[in-house]
């Protein structure tokens, strides 16, 4: 596992998209409830955001395997882990790369004790969202 440090989560997201090779015209799946900086990172690459709905527990309602995205963002809202089973199933079906956005979950773990932000192809965790740090 390689760990890189960035001053802001948006810079980490940009780097993840760069390493994945997200470019003009590529599809990136995002939850309909998302930070504008994540959306900006998609738009900066010239990629097309595709939104999936989340339920009242902020879990994905439906990930359409017919929509072939280059990357899919799984957000651990407020440090609560996403159930990655649906994301992994989707990624296997179309070759998509999962980015785990754990900006609000510093040191949070899932029910198996795994650190959030380290369970997928790419993970992003932010000190700034949990511990006030300057820009």
Language model regions located:
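Short loop-beta-helix segment that forms the pyridoxal 5′-phosphate
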Residues: 1-16, 30-31, 52-53
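Conserved beta-strand scaffold positions in the cores of enzyme catalytic domains, especially
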Residues: 3-5, 49-51, 98, 123-124
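Conserved active-site segment immediately N-terminal to the catalytic lysine
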Residues: 100-134
């Amino acid at each position: 596992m390689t760990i890189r440090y960035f001053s802001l989560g948006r810079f980490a997201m940009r780097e993840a998209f760069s390493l994945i090779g997200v470019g003009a015209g590529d599809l990136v799946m995002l939850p309909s409830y998302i930070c504008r900086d994540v959306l900006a990172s998609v738009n900066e690459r010239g990629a097309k955001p595709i939104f999936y709905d989340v339920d009242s527990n902020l879990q994905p309602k439906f990930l359409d395997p017919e929509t072939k995205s280059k990357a899919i963002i799984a957000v651990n809202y407020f440090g609560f882990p996403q159930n990655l089973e649906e994301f992994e199933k989707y990624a296997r079906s179309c070759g998509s790369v999962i980015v785990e956005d754990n900006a609000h979950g510093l040191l949070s773990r899932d029910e198996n004790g795994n650190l959030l932000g380290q369970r997928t192809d790419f993970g992003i965790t932010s000190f700034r969202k949990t511990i006030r740090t300057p820009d």
